[in-house]
Amino acid sequence: CLFEHEHSIYLNKSSATKFLRKYDLDIINFNLIKEKYRRANSLIFVAKRKVDVNVQKKELLPKNKTSKFYFDLKKNIYKGIRNLEKYSSFNKKIGKRVAGYGAGGRGVMTLASMSNSQNFKFLIEKNPKSQNIYAPGSGLQIVNLEHLKENPVDEILVFSFGYMDEIKKDLKKYGYQNNQIKSFIDIMKDGYV
């Protein structure tokens, strides 16, 4: 079986191995495609069934561990959203113009979760599918990199953090320095603002 990175669950090598063992699968190869050719935080691997498997096996984590994990995750997500809202409000208060970068699911859903996403000037996407499109929930216009020539901002918050090196390289062509490009993960952590 070929498995690839899926956005609903963010597996790493360790968690993928543990998860598949519960269903009598063994990892054959994590290096099917060399890391330098994989994009961002993608995880691609191959696994095979063990001999004499019981495919009806449904053992999951004990309920108390599962519910605590999800309760803590929910708490951390809300805390992170509050930190993003503080960041957004603070920058507006001091007159900084901020744009988001990454109109994929992570960027769109995060902005839709914020009560003040309208403080962002727009949302940049390297290759938007068309012009005059807006992110659901936040209503932010999705623009291409060229938009920055006529509409510069002071800071860019990157939601697509797995592509950070590539994004910084692209933004440098438009005059942006590394200190103007922030990862939303860093902002979500406590103590940034």
Predicted features by range, described:
Residues 21, 25, 51-52:
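Non-catalytic alpha-helical coupling and interface elements of nucleotide-dependent molecular machines
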Residues 25-36:
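Conserved S-adenosyl-L-methionine
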Residues 10, 27-29, 46, 99-100:
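Structured core elements
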Residues 38-40:
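Short acidic/glycine-enriched loop/turn segments that link adjacent beta-strands
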Residues 44-193:
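Hydrophobic, well-ordered beta-alpha structural blocks that scaffold small-molecule cofactor pockets
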Residues 1-9, 13-15, 19:
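Short, glycine-/aromatic-enriched active-site segment of Class I SAM-dependent methyltransferases
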